[in-house]
């Protein structure tokens, strides 16, 4: 005799009945909140209500007595009558026998008022559900229409509560019967129950789960059903010790059932089983391709380190609590961030246990797939794509210039990230940091509709980024340990401070968790923190980025790919495919016996160069900002190729950039940060070294009076003169000789090359307007370069500390170097006026420009403080320009030191114009106290308060 199906034993008393027993009991006509009354936890409440209603209506208590008798009769009679099941095969009680709950509710309805019952909508749209906003259930709903959001009902219906044992037992039984041909019947039975359950209105929203009834329901099952459940559960445990050849059976069966449905599969109203409940399953139960058919990238397969055939060098969804993708399975992230990190560590509450749904097949940018499981509860998928667009948006259609003030330079190619079919393989931490950077300034409605939305989303993205990055832990991932890992663990614990850096990472290869992506993630974190009021805390992120870049030897060129090189030095293979889709995420360090056989694409090589030069420039910039010595030295990158032109880089024209110089540059070569700002930072590095040598406690005085000092100053001056000449040549090449078409001596960077790299609205402008915009962009670059060049002359000849400058104990104000520095201060102010003409809001390079505007203003403050009404008109105009520039800076990238110096400069300018207050001495003393917060002498930390 065949085994009866599971719905055959469902009691009409059960709140989870599938609805197949309609012949035995009249179907309930209630919907909405009334459906909750069918749960067993409402029996006593409804009984009490029926008593009250009967007492007030009839007064004789007859209904209550009838109901009590009916309940006692039901209590004495078992809910499952095996004899009746065997005789009739229906599994239900007599159709004429009424449910006591129905009688109770009928009594209530007879005595209740005729007021309309408030109905709830069956489900809210995806946007309202994400925002926890009231929804009217329409398509589109009123909320989405008001805020211009995309109204969808695409999310999967879910049930609350713990997964039932029957689901697990049925899955195990289906797997064990697969070889006998019964697995299809079991799956059909389970899926049929889900279909009948979902057909009932209101259960997906209002369904409840009663553990007491569950235990009673299981205990009252027939004996042969209990044996089947026990066998099914034991089968799950036995599969852990089964031979490896038998393991794929259950995984294949679960995959055949489509885990997207198995994830929410229930039995007659039981709550859905979330993905976190699969943690108890053995490794062999889970399918090899992951938990969602929509998430089909093989590089992100579900890997368990205990499996002997697990693929290597891929992102892991294993059982390690240290795993950055652990929230994908509902696991808790690392408990806390390192002790040196003051930022809050990720809380497990921010990483909920997801019930996965298949990702949309129309994902605009597939590169986001690794991070989608982590951001599902933070931002919508469409907003993530929009934020990626914001990250790569250029403010100019003629030349690339990042629109976001927190993107100081492009490290990656836009086309590699946004390619629709073959995107660059990225770590989830890098993607999360890019979304976090873009969310700082995005004007999306999701981030602006409540005023607090941006702060909440940015905080969650920050915690997610830190949780995925795992600061200072860049060892091999679980299951990737080298053969001599046991010995390496001892060495790591002693020599490397227990940070988990493996010795093979310092050799020929680096693991995926310690690659270029992690360095770029540190850069994103450090940049945003540096632009905030927590500048001192940003040095921890910058130091981590510099240290990891040094470990990866990003300052050295990788050896050529011998296996793919021809005699003429060109590479074989499909260059476009290599550019868009690098073969692996890991990058070779190029030093070791095994490095010659590793192939690195030209795009990966250029990413390494650009990342190093960006860190090189910020090291020198922050050395001036925070009065600290250099970290990255010139000798570490003496053989590294200079970065290629940004426009050529974005279109992937590597052949046009084949001939480049090596080592730190000192000439202006392009419109990007790498073209005009990097050479200035090379020169600034020499000035910083001279400044710290001059102020050395033991050797400073002797070095200051030696001929070597004069020789070093002349050398830096020659570099500044070289940069000034290259700046004039650059301006002539891109303004005087610029015609409607590209000239012979100009790189082809116009037209189609920028159509796909500049998503601004001006990309469809005419050729003439683009040429004029290119001229304006060039003159703006020249103005910024000229201003910073004048400031470097001031730093080389003058004093950095404003208090020492105002006190003037050594009478430097009467020296010849002061006159030279003062002329450069006026020249810097004139360049600032030109900058305000082309860039009124100073949005071209707000992250870098503030400190040079400040240092170029100290001499003007000195002149206004000392000369007062006797100051020359040029000095007065220069002071007015500096005040305007600081006001623009405060609007664009608001920082405390700019607000403070604007007030100081305004009071000094008022004195120059003859408005001397009564408390003149007190105001001068107050100015010195304010400036004393920012010191560049002794142990002063500059802008880092």
Swiss-Prot record:
Sorted alphabetically, the Gene Ontology cellular component annotations on this record are: nucleus
Superkingdom, natural source: Eukaryota
- Segments of skewed composition (Basic and acidic residues): 73-84, 565-581
Biased composition (Low complexity) is annotated at 1-23
The GO annotation for biological process reads: DNA-templated transcription; positive regulation of DNA-templated transcription; xylan catabolic process
Segments spanning the bilayer are none
Q: Which UniProt keywords apply?
A: Activator, DNA-binding, Metal-binding, Nucleus, Transcription, Transcription regulation, Zinc
Q: Name one GO molecular function term.
A: DNA binding
User: Cross-referenced InterPro entries, in alphabetical order?
Assistant: Transcription_factor_dom_fun (IPR007219), XlnR/Xlr1 (IPR051439), Zn2-C6_fun-type_DNA-bd_sf (IPR036864), Zn2Cys6_DnaBD (IPR001138)
CDD domains (alphabetical)? fungal_TF_MHR, GAL4
Q: What ranges does the record give for the region Disordered, renumbered to this chain?
A: 1-33, 52-93, 172-210, 559-601
What subcellular compartments does it reside in?
Nucleus
Q: Which residues bind DNA?
A: 125-151
Q: What is its main location?
A: nucleus
* Keyword Ribosomal protein among record annotations: no
**Polar residues bias: where?**
63-72, 176-188
The family annotation for this protein states: Belongs to the xlnR/xlr1 family.
Function, as annotated, reads: Transcriptional activator of the xylanolytic system. Involved in the regulation of extracellular cellulolytic and xylanolytic genes and in the regulation of the intracellular activities of D-xylose catabolic genes in the pentose catabolic pathway (PCP) in response to the presence of D-xylose. Binds to the DNA sequence 5'-GGCTAAA-3'.
Name of the molecule in the record:
Xylanolytic transcriptional activator xlnR
Give the organism the record lists: Aspergillus niger (strain ATCC MYA-4892 / CBS 513.88 / FGSC A1513)
């Amino acid at each position: 005799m065949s085994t009866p199906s599971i719905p055959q034993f469902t009691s009409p008393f059960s709140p989870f009945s599938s609805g197949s027993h309609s012949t035995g009991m009249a179907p309930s006509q209630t919907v909405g909140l009334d459906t909750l009354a069918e749960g067993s936890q409402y029996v006593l409440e409804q009984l009490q209500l029926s008593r009250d209603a009967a007492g007030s209506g009839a007064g004789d208590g007859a209904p209550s007595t009838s109901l009590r008798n009916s309940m006692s009769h039901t209590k004495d009679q078992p809910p499952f009558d095996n004899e009746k099941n065997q005789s009739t095969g229906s599994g239900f009680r007599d159709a004429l026998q009424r449910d006591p709950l129905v009688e109770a509710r009928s009594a209530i309805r007879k005595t209740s008022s005729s007021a309309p019952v408030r109905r709830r909508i069956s489900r809210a749209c995806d946007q309202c559900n994400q925002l926890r906003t009231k929804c009217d259930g329409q398509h589109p709903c009123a909320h989405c229409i008001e805020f211009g959001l995309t109204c969808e009902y695409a999310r999967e219906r879910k049930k609350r509560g713990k997964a039932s044992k029957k689901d697990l037992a049925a899955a195990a039984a289906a797997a064990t019967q697969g070889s006998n041909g019964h697995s299809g019947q079991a799956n059909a039975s389970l899926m049929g129950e889900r279909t009948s359950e979902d057909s009932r209105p209101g259960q997906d929203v209002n369904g409840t789960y009663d553990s007491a009834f569950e235990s009673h329901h299981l205990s009252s099952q027939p004996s042969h059903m209990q044996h089947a459940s026990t066998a099914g559960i034991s089968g799950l445990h036995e599969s852990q010790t089964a031979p490896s050849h038998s393991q794929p059976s259950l995984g294949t069966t679960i995959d055949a059932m489509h885990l997207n449905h198995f994830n929410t599969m229930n039995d007659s109203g039981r709550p859905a089983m979330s993905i976190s409940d699969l943690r108890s399953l053995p490794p062999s139960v889970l399918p090899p391709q992951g938990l969602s058919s929509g998430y089909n990238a093989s590089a992100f397969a579900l890997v368990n380190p205990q499996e002997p055939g697990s693929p290597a060098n891929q992102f892991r969804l294993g059982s390690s609590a240290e795993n950055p993708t652990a929230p994908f399975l509902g696991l808790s992230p690392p408990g806390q961030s390192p002790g040196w990190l003051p930022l809050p560590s990720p809380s497990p509450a921010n990483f909920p246990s997801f019930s996965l749904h298949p990702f949309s097949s129309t994902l605009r940018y597939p590169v986001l797939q690794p991070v989608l499981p982590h951001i599902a509860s933070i931002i919508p998928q469409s907003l993530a794509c929009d934020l990626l667009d914001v990250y790569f948006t250029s403010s100019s259609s003629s030349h690339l210039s990042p629109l976001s003030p927190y993107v100081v330079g492009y490290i990656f190619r836009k086309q590699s990230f946004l390619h629709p079919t073959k995107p660059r393989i990225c770590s989830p931490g890098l993607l999360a940091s890019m979304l976090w950077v873009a969310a700082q300034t995005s004007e999306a409605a999701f981030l602006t509709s409540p005023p607090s939305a941006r702060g909440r989303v940015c905080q969650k993205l920050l915690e997610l980024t830190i949780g995925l990055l795992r600061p200072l832990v860049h060892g091999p991932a679980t299951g990737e340990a080298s053969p001599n890992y046991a010995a390496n663990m001892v060495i790591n614990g002693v020599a490397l401070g227990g940070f988990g850096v493996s010795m093979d990472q310092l050799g020929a290869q680096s693991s995926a968790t310690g690659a270029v992506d992690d360095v770029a993630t540190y850069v994103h974190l450090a940049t945003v923190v540096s632009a905030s009021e927590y500048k001192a805390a940003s040095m921890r992120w910058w130091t981590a980025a510099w240290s990891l870049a040094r470990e990866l030897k990003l300052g050295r060129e990788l050896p050529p790919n011998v296996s793919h090189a021809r005699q003429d030095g060109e590479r074989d293979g499909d260059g476009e495919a290599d550019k868009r889709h690098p073969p692996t995420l890991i990058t070779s360090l190029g030093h070791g016996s095994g490095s010659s056989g590793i192939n690195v694409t030209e795009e990966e090589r250029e990413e390494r160069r650009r990342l190093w030069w960006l860190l090189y420039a910020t090291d020198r910039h922050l050395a001036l900002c925070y009065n600290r010595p250099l970290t990255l030295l010139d000798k570490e990158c003496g053989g590294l190729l200079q970065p290629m032109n940004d426009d050529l880089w974005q279109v992937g024209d590597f052949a046009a950039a084949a001939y480049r110089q090596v080592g730190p540059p000192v000439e202006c070569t392009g419109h990007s940060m790498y073209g005009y700002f990097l050479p200035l930072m090379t020169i600034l590095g020499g000035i910083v070294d001279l400044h710290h040598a001059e102020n050395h406690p033991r050797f400073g005085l002797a070095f200051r009076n030696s001929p070597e000092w004069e020789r070093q100053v002349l050398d830096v001056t020659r570099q500044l003169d070289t940069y000034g000449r290259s700046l004039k040549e650059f301006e002539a090449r891109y303004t005087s000789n610029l015609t409607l078409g590209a000239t012979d001596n100009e790189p082809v960077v116009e037209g189609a090359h920028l159509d796909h790299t500049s998503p601004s609205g001006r990309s469809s402008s005419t050729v003439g307007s683009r040429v004029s915009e290119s001229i304006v962009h060039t003159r703006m670059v020249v103005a910024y370069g000229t201003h910073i060049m004048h400031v470097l002359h001031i730093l080389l000849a003058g004093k950095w500390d404003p208090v020492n400058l105002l006190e003037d104990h050594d009478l430097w104000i009467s020296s010849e170097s002061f006159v030279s520095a003062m002329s450069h201060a006026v020249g810097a102010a004139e360049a600032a006026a030109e900058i305000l003409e082309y860039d009124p809001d100073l949005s071209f390079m707000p992250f870098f420009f503030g400190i040079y505007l400040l240092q170029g203003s100290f001499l003007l403050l000195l002149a206004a403080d000392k000369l007062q009404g006797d100051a020359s008109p040029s000095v007065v105009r220069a002071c007015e320009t500096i005040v305007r520039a600081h006001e623009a800076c405060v609007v664009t990238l608001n920082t405390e030191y700019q607000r403070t110096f604007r007030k100081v400069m305004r009071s000094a300018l008022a004195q120059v114009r003859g408005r001397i207050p009564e408390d003149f001495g007190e105001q001068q003393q107050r100015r010195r106290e304010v400036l004393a917060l920012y010191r560049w002498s002794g142990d002063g930390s500059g802008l880092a308060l």
